[in-house]
A protein has these predicted regions:
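A short beta-strand/loop micro-motif in the catalytic core of glycosyltransferases
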Residues: 68-69, 96, 130-140
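Carbohydrate-associated surface elements
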Residues: 141, 162
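Conserved catalytic-core segment of nucleotide-activated headgroup transferases in glycan assembly
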Residues: 11-26, 39, 164-266, 271
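Membrane-proximal helix-turn-helix segments that form the acceptor-binding/catalytic region
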Residues: 53-57, 63, 83-91, 115-135
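An aromatic- and histidine-rich active-site surface loop
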Residues: 70-90, 104, 197-200
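Acceptor-binding helix/loop patch of EC 2.4 sugar-transfer enzymes
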Residues: 96-125, 166-170, 181
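N-terminal pre-catalytic "stem/leader" segment of glycosyltransferase-like enzymes
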Residues: 1-75
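Nucleotide-sugar-dependent
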Residues: 192-195, 260-299, 305-310
Length: 310
């Protein structure tokens, strides 16, 4: 019989893509004769409109699986993720839980700091670690920080981030520069980097003064796409980003803000850069991040200027 794996991504964002969606699709592609995979972001049957539980839900996918694999905290909430683990154990399943952020130590200044404290999400994550059979994280220091919360009879392993360079977006031609002595700086970021950008906001003005704004350009990628509802909280994030970013610019415009790409098109953003930027505040949360930016920028042979953490 094939090994049956139920994959429960937290959402469809970049973290879920790199940590569960892409690797498990690759596993199925390479070993489809040995594994069978089902996908279900809502295996507990919560009503997605009002958050109520369906009383007659049969948990068919969970009962079918040998392994229940989930990651981070579901868009349905931390308690929902914990219940996935609890139900899987109730049905006698092997539970694999993956995280790519240090959710047990959110730093002050992180956009979700108050939410994590008010909803007890750090403690919920510790509970999930303790009740999972296999916990995977992205790097060694991360593993050392969460080891105290894991069950000593379970397995804690480092599974590094990787990129499928066979995807078309990682095999595109670079966008030509307008002239030879011209440098395009690029920043690609999600929606939790307000504190990190503060460490960078003065840099563009300094560089523009030294080399001349006509000889360089600054591109910021990740703005919510045009079809995002106007009341979506991501717009508020990028309004704050914009305020922070533009503090570093005086005079003529040599910057632009670009829409986010879906994870399977990330590579396209790096075709427009000559130097990639990844400023981070030094703290345990950021020091637990992976080297994924090296893999992204490196594919297009772009130097990466980053904080020495992680």
């Amino acid at each position: 019989d094939k090994l049956k794996i139920l994959c429960v991504p937290a959402n469809e964002g970049g973290c879920a893509y790199y940590r569960i969606i892409a690797p498990m699709k690759k596993l199925e592609e390479l070993y489809g004769d040995r594994v069978e995979i089902r996908w279900n972001k809502n295996p507990l049957g919560i009503n997605e409109k009002d958050g109520s539980w369906q009383q007659d839900w049969d948990f068919a996918d969970m009962k079918w699986a040998d392994i229940v694999f989930t990651q981070n905290l579901s868009n349905f909430g931390g308690n929902y993720t914990a219940r996935i683990v609890g139900k899987a154990k109730e049905f006698g399943k092997f539970v694999h839980y993956d995280t790519d952020d240090l959710l047990t130590n959110i730093y002050e200044g992180h956009r979700l700091y108050n939410v994590y404290k008010e909803k007890g999400l750090e403690e919920i994550t510790k509970f999930i670690y303790h009740h999972s059979d296999l916990v995977t994280v992205t790097q060694r220091k991360f593993a050392e920080r969460v080891a105290p919360y894991c069950n000593p009879n379970s397995t804690l392993a480092v599974v590094k981030n990787s990129i499928d360079y066979n995807l078309p977006c990682w095999n595109m031609n670079k966008v030509p520069k307008p002239k030879k002595k011209y440098t395009r700086f690029g920043w690609v970021g999600g929606i939790h980097h307000e504190q990190d950008l503060k460490y960078f906001s003065g840099v563009p003005h300094f560089v523009n003064q030294r080399v001349g704004r006509e000889n360089c350009r600054w591109d910021f990628f990740g703005h919510p796409p045009p079809n995002t509802p106007p009341d979506d909280w991501q717009h508020d994030v990028w309004r704050k980003y914009r305020d922070i970013i533009l503090r570093g610019f005086k005079g003529g415009k040599n910057w632009d803000i670009h829409y986010a790409q879906t994870p399977d098109r990330y590579g396209q953003m790096f075709t427009m850069m000559d130097v990639a930027l990844a400023p981070l505040e030094m703290n345990p949360f950021n020091d637990s991040k992976s080297e994924i930016k090296v893999a992204e920028a490196g594919r297009y042979k772009i130097p990466l200027v980053a904080t020495n953490c992680g």
